[in-house]
Amino acid sequence: MTNNSGNNSGNSNNPRTENHFDYVRITLASPERIMEWGQRTLPNGQIVGEVTKPETINYRTLKPEMDGLFCEKIFGPSKDWECHCGKYKRVRHRGIVCERCGVEVTESRVRRHRMGFIKLAAPVSHVWYLKGIPSYVAILLDMPLRDVEQIVYFNCYTVLSPGDNSNLFYQQLLTEDEWLEIEDETYAEDSKIISEPIVGIGAEALKYLLKELDLPFIGDGLRQEITGSKGQRRAKLIKRLRVIDNFIATGAKPEWMVLDVVPVIPPDLRPMVQLDGGRFATSDLNDLYRRVINRNNRLGRLKEILAPEIIIRNEKRMLQEAVDALIDNGRRGRTVVGANNRPLKSLSDIIEGKQGRFRQNLLGKRVDYSGRSVIVVGPRLKIHQCGLPKEMAIELFQPFVIHRLIRQNIVNNIKAAKKLIQRADDEVMQVLQEVIEGHPILLNRAPTLHRLGIQAFEPKLVDGRAIQLHPLVCPAFNADFDGDQMAVHVPLSIEAQTEARILMLASANILSPATGEPVITPSQDMVLGIYYLTSSKPAQTQPAFGERGLTFANTYDVISAYDNDRIGLHTWIWVRFSGEVEDDDESEMPIKIETAEDGSYTELWRYRRERFDKDKALVSRYLLTTVGRVIMNTSIMNSINAN
């Protein structure tokens, strides 16, 4: 099993003081450490902790059975400040151990962290280290996994000491028949064997083999062997050396991979609750623990009455399978199922996966001042803005709104403010608008694979229930608008708001931190829209210069005519333009030059017409272009001038 430890720097005198840890260490736990977790000495000197009975609760009194899986003596009282028999009630009896039932009078929440243990009648192998990938037991013993399994599950004997028998060697596998033959030879009348061979079977034999390993000596030998080997053999040696070095570095012993003691997790983490109809719903772990205790107790009784070896061996195998199912149901052998043929959830199932303890409860905690909604495109937003639904904003910023309502003397207390907020008056919306002004929010899209997966935006109140997102920031989030959801978080402190505004604002994250390439690049319908806006219809006839309705004095007249539906998006027009022009005209000379009597002249190009005075100073320039290109150019120029 694993052992979590750290340096506690908290004040241990006060039971309510939180424990502060410098680090968490996860290593193999020794049998003594597992017993330490569960064993406690009560104030009266009595030692408790071992769970010896498979019972959970008494179905008449509905109270936990003593020495069972929910025992109050081991795990603490079910009700605050009340012992099992009811002799002591109330907080004034804190710390007293009842003389009748032996339960310490304390808070019931201790049942969330007090552990117990089951002392096994025979050692069992830990299924993670036996059947895991890679199998650490097989690597350490330098044996095939199949052979190790044959030993653990009582299919084959292994030679622990060959004795004087020259036909045997250390760790050799023997079937039942082969061992019987060797026994007959060893104990025959004419036998010359003085030192008898010793064989073992089951987890006991495995524990012996692991205990005999001299890790530093084996490590030195492997290092020498690695220098002279290559290919697959070298890779195998390195893998074994790495495991050995880890054991040496952590101070763990290989035999700890075989369990003599099984920890029992606190009862409130595997609860049993009564349903409406009087029936009980219980955690699957209780069934798995019950199987282990039943088989363990049965094995203990069989050993006491000196039952035949074959029966004891079968019971040991069943105990091994029960512990396997408890630790990792389905890893080996037949999966243990409950009602409706549903596989029971083991300790591993509770820890691993998306719904496991780490990802669900420790890494992915629910936080206050956060929300979640579907995202839709907000093309009218600025790049540093996002559309926040009013319904969501009023909930997220409620404390700020209440504070401002009271400060502005609109209401007198929090209760009145909440009533006003529920009605969603215009007054409230006005205050909300003031609150969110300049208060950035964080948007996050899972999975957050790089730092641009969470960015800050200025919220803009919008109707509806969807968050509006600027289309250009989608590549950074790897988001699209086919039903993606995003989470909203509100930075509360001034420091957090400042950090969000300076470091995390979307307009400050234009380049990818990984490659230095721009991460804000238009794509899909943005590119298509720009293409459609600036494309032309070659077949359309181009107007003559000065043609009525198609020659304009400036770009604003063009946009005004388009807005009034007098011209289309792809209509060819002449427009006067005073800015710089970069022409991609292939010919370097104008098509035609018209000279006037006063010495002024006009150059005619394919897409432009320029008039100069006699001193060659530009008088006017008209461009032949489309309405869409004028709109595009004006938008870009306005953005540049605004900045």
Curated annotation (Swiss-Prot):
The keyword Plastid belongs to this UniProt entry's keyword annotation: yes
Location in the cell: Plastid, Organellar chromatophore
EC number(s) given by UniProt: 2.7.7.6
Main EC class the enzyme belongs to: transferase
Keywords, comma-separated and alphabetical: DNA-directed RNA polymerase, Magnesium, Metal-binding, Nucleotidyltransferase, Organellar chromatophore, Plastid, Transcription, Transferase, Zinc
Stretches of the chain forming a coiled coil according to its record: none
Catalytic activity line of the entry: RNA(n) + a ribonucleoside 5'-triphosphate = RNA(n+1) + diphosphate
Entry binding sites for Zn(2+): 83, 85, 98, 101
Gene Ontology MF, one: DNA binding
Family: Belongs to the RNA polymerase beta' chain family. RpoC1 subfamily.
Quaternary assembly: In plastids the minimal PEP RNA polymerase catalytic core is composed of four subunits: alpha, beta, beta', and beta''. When a (nuclear-encoded) sigma factor is associated with the core the holoenzyme is formed, which can initiate transcription.
Protein name: DNA-directed RNA polymerase subunit beta'
Organism, as annotated: Paulinella chromatophora
